[in-house]
UniProtKB/Swiss-Prot annotation:
Main subcellular location of this protein, as a coarse class: secreted
Protein name from the UniProt record: Carcinustatin-19
PTM sites of type Leucine amide: 10
One example of a Gene Ontology biological process annotation: neuropeptide signaling pathway
Species annotation: Carcinus maenas (Common shore crab)
A Gene Ontology term for the protein's cellular component: extracellular region
Signal peptide: none
Domain of life: Eukaryota
């Protein structure tokens, strides 16, 4: 997902 725990949606 784009805004996951490690992917901060950057």
């Amino acid at each position: 997902a784009p805004t996951d725990m490690y992917s901060f949606g950057l």
